[in-house]
């Protein structure tokens, strides 16, 4: 995969048995930087920590436009840009 150096944002990615987290792990294995968004603040921090250094977990309710804007600002602050968006929440 051509993911080295790419930045991916994955919503609904904190569930360790779900498609979002599995995709996040695959992206990391192929060199991407990943930001996981999830409504569960504790789970999203733990999921990002499991991915390793250089990845972030952001608590975000994707049904709240303001929360999405704040999450986008946090991702841009951390990585500078976004290459891939996987809307997996819900």
Q: Locations of the language-model features?
A:
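Conserved Rossmann-like nucleotide-binding pocket used by diverse enzymes
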Residues: 9, 35, 56-58, 85
